[in-house]
């Protein structure tokens, strides 16, 4: 089979600070009012009173959704979405395009390595540039799968299990239990600036959900980089009587020594997890050496599927689990091939967590959601990632080449 070359790459955005508010999509923090994900949730900015009531107050939704589409010579297209918005469009159209166009659709690793090397001087170890590279990488995998007529998970070697089971992230673990999920992860609402009173309030929230959900349902806390080691350790011990399964991302990404100390001092049987805001394989190698129990890369932020596969192999060599952060179909096709990912995350994007809404709604068409907390591998059997771009969204292409 002669594979075509890539003819063109294009980049659009929706939402963010320069477009309509509440667009959702790849930037799932960009929601309308009265939504749990934009509510009073602890963040690194919560110590400032002007920015503690809502995550949107400090600008969590300013980037918007980046959409990257790659087109082959035969007219077939692949696409992906992430969080990078208009600035990501500039990086794709004015810099990364030279490494993509003219390459064979199977040259994914070559393109990936060239994108990393060419942006190293302004990308650091993550953030906006890595989100953009991730989006391009995912679009390339989608195109390759569509050209050869295979789902991405089969390109990775095939499924190691028949279905993916999920826990749900949202404000209502009790509703998640009714929907068939294996666990529920809640955001914390208080931080070090709130002192012991904040610890008592979040521990009381866990206690309340334990009473509602019963003794066996998993409960976890997502701390979103908002704590220090001392506070996180106290919170973990305060929640231990309520059988908290893990405490997540308590510290900023680069505080590796802090994670090592937290893991050492956490209650017996409680896991320590992180990785959502780490980018590059190298940062995950350092994170793995802290001894945390689960690494949680976001495939749309860490360097794409190409990097996620490398992270999973690294974790496996150290006996650690990899449970990616959200990411819907882009994670599904990966984790069903990983032997060290026994479950996955589903992010509840309905405002009150009472219904199942696709994570990247409305930008993806045919995006699956779990049924009774599970997705069978047969749901993933369409070529590529199995979804299509909703071109009825207000796509904006600010740059071209």
Curated annotation (Swiss-Prot):
> A single Gene Ontology molecular function, please?
magnesium ion binding
Which of this chain's residues are annotated to bind substrate?
A: 29, 55, 345
Can you name this protein? L-rhamnonate dehydratase
Q: What is its EC number?
A: 4.2.1.90
Extra information: Reaction proceeds via a syn dehydration.
Recorded hits in PANTHER family, A to Z, give:
ENOLASE SUPERFAMILY, MANDELATE RACEMASE, MITOCHONDRIAL ENOLASE SUPERFAMILY MEMBER 1
Q: From which source organism is this entry?
A: Salmonella heidelberg (strain SL476)
* EC top class, as a word: lyase
At what residues does the UniProt record annotate the site feature described as Transition state stabilizer? 345
Instruction: Please list the residues that make up the active site.
Output: 325
**Which GO annotations describe the biological process of this protein?**
amino acid catabolic process; carbohydrate catabolic process
Cofactor binding remark: Binds 1 Mg(2+) ion per subunit.
Q: Which cofactor does it need?
A: Mg(2+)
**SUPFAM superfamilies in the record:** Enolase C-terminal domain-like, Enolase N-terminal domain-like
Report keywords, A-Z: Lyase, Magnesium, Metal-binding
Family to which this protein belongs: Belongs to the mandelate racemase/muconate lactonizing enzyme family. RhamD subfamily.
Gene that encodes it: rhmD
Q: Does the keyword Transmembrane apply?
A: no
Subunit structure of this chain's protein? Homooctamer; tetramer of dimers.
Q: So what does this thing catalyse? A: L-rhamnonate = 2-dehydro-3-deoxy-L-rhamnonate + H2O
Signal peptide positions (record): none
Enumerate the residues binding Mg(2+).
222, 248, 276
An example Pfam family from this entry, by short name, is MR_MLE_C
- Give the source lineage, highest ranks first: Bacteria, Pseudomonadati, Pseudomonadota, Gammaproteobacteria, Enterobacterales
The task this protein performs is described as: Catalyzes the dehydration of L-rhamnonate to 2-keto-3-deoxy-L-rhamnonate (KDR).
Question: Site: Increases basicity of active site His. Where?
Answer: 298
